[in-house]
A protein has these predicted regions:
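A cytosolic small-molecule/anion-sensing beta-strand core signal
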Residues: 9, 144-145
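DPxDG-like acidic metal-binding loop motif
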Residues: 68, 100-126, 142-144
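Generic structural marker for isolated residues within well-ordered, non-membrane alpha-helices
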Residues: 28, 72, 113, 129-130
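Acidic/histidine-rich catalytic neighborhood of metal-dependent amide-processing enzymes
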Residues: 134, 145-146
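Short, well-structured alpha-helical segments that form the helix of a local strand-helix-strand
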Residues: 125-136
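ATP-binding N-lobe of GHMP and related small-molecule kinases
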Residues: 1-100, 118, 122
Length: 146
């Protein structure tokens, strides 16, 4: 079975830096809005283990440097399935520009987490998916919840 997800970009309507965490990241207060500008993410399972990622843009990484790949790895490391962990095939059709502040990578990661939750019948809550997503990128929880 294959699931195709649309992964919408987001914009920051406001962004206020309120401090800095001990790890160097900024504390922020922001208002975000999802927009109708999407990547397309196809996810399917196969018997053989491992993650295979392809991306329509050959300049983008198709390995553990990619947030879609890291999301799948984080999901598989967290999920408690009765059967052996499946292999995962992911294809990302990129439309959202990279490094444009539109959360394209985070949107792709959120789509992968949501699709894997459905495909594996893991029955994780949105909160649980957000916890996994937070380990992949700061904007992933917003992209899960919209």
């Amino acid at each position: 079975m294959e699931i195709t997800m649309l992964a919408p970009a987001k914009i920051n309507l406001t962004l206020d830096i309120t401090g800095r965490r001990e790890d160097g990241y900024h504390l922020i207060h922001t208002i975000m809005q999802a927009v109708d500008y999407t990547d397309e993410v196809r996810v399917s399972l196969r018997e053989a283990g491992g993650i295979r990622l392809t991306v329509s843009d050959p300049t983008l990484p198709a390995d553990a440097r990619n947030t879609a790949y890291r999301a799948a790895a984080a999901f598989l490391a967290t999920v408690d399935l009765e059967e052996a962990l499946p292999g995962v095939d992911i294809h990302v059709t990129k439309r959202i520009p990279m490094e444009a502040g539109l959360a394209g990578g985070s949107a792709d990661a959120a789509a992968v987490l949501t699709a894997l939750n459905w495909l594996t019948d893991a029955h994780m809550t949105a909160e649980e998916l957000c916890e996994i997503g937070q380990t992949v990128g700061a904007d992933v929880p917003f992209c899960i919840l919209g």
